[in-house]
Amino acid sequence: MKLTFLGAGAWGTALASHAAAANDVVLWGRDPAQLAAIAATRENAAYLPGVTLSERLAVQADFEQAVAHAADDADGIVVVATPVAGLREMTRRLAARGARPVSMLWLCKGFESGTHLLPHQMVRAELDAAGRTEGFAYGVLTGPSFAREVALGLPCALTVAGNEPSLAERAQAAFHHHAMRIYGSDDLTGVEVGGAVKNVLAIATGASDGLGLGLNARAALVTRGLAEMTRLGLALGGRVETFMGLAGVGDLILTATGDLSRNRKVGQQLAAGQSLEQILAGLGHVAEGVRCAQAVAELASAYGVEMPIARAVCAVLFDGLSAADAVAQLLQRDARDE
């Protein structure tokens, strides 16, 4: 199968390298020098230092040629590997092509800043505006996955959800090999809510661990955080079983407890007294939990959903509340049934 990856960051590169073992894969990025270095050294030194990439992975600096590689093939898939902030631009560029409709997957997790739209809602809006909804297959590949582990060939299980069953089937054919398993879903809303909210909750568990509050506290935050994720997901139209799966509790456990998690690191550094500006300056990579915390809190208010942990994270990030005071406030909440 022909696949094109748009975005040469950690996750796009890792998944492209995995896919190249069984498919005809092209990787595009905004920096031609970075792509040339990947081709010459078989390493993405900026995002996956020390990891050897597949010899079968090809790079292409020309956007149109890269897209045409997969988009002009009947079964091909264009994989958008940008953060949420770049998804509209990529969708717009794909929709503007005069050729046949594109099958596209994205890898990003979060809500759009300002609109609070989920990724599939952003994509649908762009396709509607371009008059290109007919024939476009689109969806998300998501779940508990650290890019470095995938690039190293370690076991991983993900969920693909799309607007057409045929896209999920092709994604399974493309990625379900070696150490990766792909499960299908038709709950686009549910899997995307899980992927967005878990990043915010991971900041909370990171802060708890940074304050030395122990494993009991971590387990409580993960469990009650899952309840918050599920409540918001149901309010937005997701299904409860989705949050019990890979895109819900699975991704939450990994991001909240794994030391490779950028969102968890943000919480740990907030607990150590660093400012958000200092943390983001030193991070070097995207921490989507910071970007979507406000959206989660505002959606909770708009839909009347109780999300005290997510609200506490938002207050620490943007309202000057200390991590220690946020924990104290959560502990002072009235007793209630689970």
UniProtKB/Swiss-Prot annotation:
Any one GO MF term held by the record is: glycerol-3-phosphate dehydrogenase [NAD(P)+] activity
Q: Which residues act catalytically here?
A: K198
Q: Which InterPro entries match?
A: 6-PGluconate_DH-like_C_sf, 6PGD_dom2, G3P_DH_NAD-dep, G3P_DH_NAD-dep_C, G3P_DH_NAD-dep_N, NAD(P)-bd_dom_sf
User: Which controlled-vocabulary keywords does the entry list?
Assistant: Cytoplasm, Lipid biosynthesis, Lipid metabolism, NAD, NADP, Nucleotide-binding, Oxidoreductase, Phospholipid biosynthesis, Phospholipid metabolism
- One matching Pfam family, short form? NAD_Gly3P_dh_C
Gene Ontology CC: one annotated term: cytosol
As for subcellular location, the record says:
Cytoplasm
This enzyme catalyses: sn-glycerol 3-phosphate + NAD(+) = dihydroxyacetone phosphate + NADH + H(+); sn-glycerol 3-phosphate + NADP(+) = dihydroxyacetone phosphate + NADPH + H(+)
UniProt superkingdom:
Bacteria
The record's Gene Ontology biological-process terms are:
carbohydrate metabolic process; glycerol-3-phosphate biosynthetic process; glycerol-3-phosphate catabolic process; glycerophospholipid metabolic process; phospholipid biosynthetic process
Q: In which pathway does it act?
A: Membrane lipid metabolism; glycerophospholipid metabolism
**NCBIfam families recorded:** PRK00094.1-2, PRK00094.1-4
Its recorded name reads: Glycerol-3-phosphate dehydrogenase [NAD(P)+]
**Taxonomy-wise, where does this protein's organism fall, top ranks first?**
Bacteria, Pseudomonadati, Pseudomonadota, Betaproteobacteria, Burkholderiales
